[in-house]
Amino acid sequence: MKRLVLWLLVVFCFASAEAQHFKAYRGAVPGSYNFWFHDPENGAHKDPKAHFPLLIFLHGRSLSGHNLDKVKRYGPISAVAKGLSIDSYIMAPQTSNGWAPDKVMQLVDWAIKNYSVDTTRIYVYGMSMGGYGTIDVCATYPDRIAAGMAACGGATVKNLEGLSKLPLWILHGTADRAVPFSASQKVVDAMEKTGTDRLIFTPLKGVDHGRPARLFYMTQTYDWLFSHSTKDPGREVCRDFKVTPEMLSKAYEDLRDLKSNSDKEDEYME
């Protein structure tokens, strides 16, 4: 009985800690998506002059629907709950079918209106369907997005010229059977024709579709994103970071409680 009570207490404390990090919003932005929001100060706003970056996470198809709890399966909500510190506002919306750049930007405007967002440091990242969404948002709003990271995705918008205006990191596993490697390659080929020097393309040799989701648990992912600002002279891309298949394999080692769950979590990532 004592063990049961202790176990329930641990679960309750974990759930309470997670709730303090993220708050669910449903219907807060008419015409847009429901979303989770993370306030790094937990509503305290200790320094009224402090402004934080805003990070937008776009999930893959497996998390689509009308149940916001599905968005906890992988990505920043899971990463923060398991011990990763991300010092920024985070929005994790949920879509039922694809990502519309205009709707994503409605969420950004809501965050700017309600929180002290550093408007020069707004970032978007995602994988699979979220990778498509990331590229579409970056192509549509390059002047508002400081940097983007798209894993195992592609593009649905026809005009990709905007991608040449901001730092963008595209990653894709060569063994991806869900979204072919060629989907990212087409975007890269189109960007290279513009002569852009703001693109990083990382083919992940032998990596399948689910493994790149470990990017969301790696500190260098956030270090790279947060190193950019729309105020940077020339909007240069930072090339001080890299991602390899080996680094993805070790992504969970520095985070609590992830080792035993790593293979199981990959099953949900698409």
Predicted regions: what they are:
Residues 164, 169-172, 176:
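Short beta-strand/loop motif that positions the catalytic acidic residue
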Residues 111-114, 120-164:
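Primarily recognizes the serine-hydrolase "nucleophile elbow" in alpha/beta-hydrolase
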Residues 69-71, 180-190:
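Short alpha-helix in the alpha/beta-hydrolase fold that links the catalytic acid
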Residues 17-54, 132, 137-140, 187-189, ...:
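A domain-start/cap signature at the N-terminus of enzymes
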Residues 191-210:
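Catalytic histidine neighborhood in serine/cysteine hydrolases
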Residues 42-50, 99-128:
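Gly/Ser-rich "nucleophile elbow"/oxyanion-hole loop immediately N-terminal to the catalytic nucleophile
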Residues 52-54, 58-107:
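Active-site machinery of serine-nucleophile hydrolases
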Residues 61, 95-96, 174-177, 205-208:
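Acidic beta-to-alpha connecting loop that harbors the catalytic carboxylate
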